[in-house]
């Protein structure tokens, strides 16, 4: 009996992953719906009851989240710009990314983390700009305080990131909290990692007051860093993401390979290896790399060898208008000429198999 039971436990993590329902964050589709909050709340498919309640109760927050979707998707596309999968979105798909994120891959881990971070960033910024009725600047940052440079007064408007994190947790995590499967736990972990990433780059900014800028008095406030810092940080976490399996009681993770460290709350986790994204694959949700621009001189992921998966590339000769002969004129302008520049553009060849054009 021991051998069969041991075999069952060995396969259990894989079974939990395979039996995972098709989890996706339908709130991502808020970017496409737009319009009034009522229209948005009623027409975004797949929202759970608590999400719809928050949506109707806080229309101003929903507007911020909706506007933020474009921001974090753009950041995702920036980070993946030189990779085979480039975080492409599908406007007519309510999951925004299609089937590609149904796989519990490291790409899914990154998207859930960056989207959760994007919600925190968008809500917190809207609070500071006075666009949300239920929050404002951080009320805890008042009076005097002390740092390594001495005593200062809290002033200005400190970003109320705790409100942003609290609302993001309630709204973004709602759907995953209803599930007890492996994918839901993975999403919750990566959502939290994304929220923590934004707070990691909260920085103190100060203004000096005194004769000739002597800084006799200082007024300080806390401000979020540019979202690019969060994106760069999560990109590093993506490259160091840890593959995990469910533990035997189904309540948490353990590393898939004992040589790797146990993931912290800041790490991204994933279950399944990624496809190679070389060819268009309906089931995997991959658009392939045919027609993608590649870099002939690079040795990285954007090189023609890697990007084109060994299929080769086509070269076209193009001309483009560019600025040239720029000169500085006192004071204070830079004047340039318009010049035509000839260059070679290299694009990946399509697979020889004609089935690659099958639409996803």
From Swiss-Prot:
Alphabetized GO MF terms: cytokine activity; frizzled binding
One Pfam assignment: wnt
Record's GO cellular component terms: cytoplasm; extracellular space
UniProt superkingdom: Eukaryota
Post-translational modification: Palmitoleoylation is required for efficient binding to frizzled receptors. Depalmitoleoylation leads to Wnt signaling pathway inhibition.
Cell location: Secreted, Extracellular space, Extracellular matrix; Secreted
Glycosylation sites: 295
Family: Belongs to the Wnt family.
Record's protein name: Protein Wnt-2
Name of the gene: WNT2
């Amino acid at each position: 009996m021991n051998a069969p039971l041991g075999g069952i436990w060995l396969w259990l993590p894989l079974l939990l992953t395979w039996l995972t329902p098709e989890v996706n964050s339908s709130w991502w589709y808020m970017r496409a719906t737009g319009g009034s909050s009522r229209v948005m709340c009623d027409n975004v498919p797949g929202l759970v009851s608590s999400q719809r309640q928050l949506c109707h109760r806080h229309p101003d927050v929903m507007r911020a989240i909706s506007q933020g979707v474009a921001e974090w998707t753009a950041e995702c596309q920036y980070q993946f710009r030189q990779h085979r999968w480039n975080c492409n979105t599908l406007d007519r798909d309510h999951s925004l990314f299609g089937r590609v994120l149904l796989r519990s891959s490291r790409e899914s881990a990154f998207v859930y983390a960056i989207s959760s971070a994007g919600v925190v960033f968008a809500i917190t910024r809207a609070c500071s700009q006075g666009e949300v009725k239920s929050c404002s600047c951080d009320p805890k940052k008042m009076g005097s305080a002390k740092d390594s440079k001495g005593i200062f007064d809290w002033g200005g408007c400190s970003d109320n990131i705790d409100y942003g994190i609290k609302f993001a947790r309630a709204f973004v995590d709602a759907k995953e909290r209803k599930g007890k499967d492996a994918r839901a736990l993975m999403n919750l972990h990566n959502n939290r990692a994304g929220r923590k990433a934004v707070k990691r780059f909260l920085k103190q900014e100060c203004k000096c007051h005194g004769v000739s800028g002597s800084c006799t008095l200082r007024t300080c406030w806390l401000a979020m860093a540019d979202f690019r810092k969060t994106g760069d940080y999560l990109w590093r976490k993506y490259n160091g993401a840890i593959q995990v399996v469910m533990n035997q009681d189904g309540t948490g993770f353990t590393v898939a390979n004992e040589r790797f460290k146990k993931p912290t709350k800041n790490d991204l986790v994933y279950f399944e290896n990624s496809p190679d994204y070389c060819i268009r694959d309906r089931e995997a949700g991959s658009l392939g790399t045919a027609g993608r621009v590649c870099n002939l001189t690079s040795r990285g992921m954007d090189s023609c060898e890697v990007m084109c998966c060994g299929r080769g590339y086509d070269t076209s000769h193009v001309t483009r208008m560019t600025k040239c002969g720029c000169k500085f004129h006192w004071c204070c302008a830079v004047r340039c000429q318009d010049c035509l520049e000839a260059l070679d553009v290299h694009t990946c060849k399509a697979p020889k198999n004609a089935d690659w054009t099958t639409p996803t």
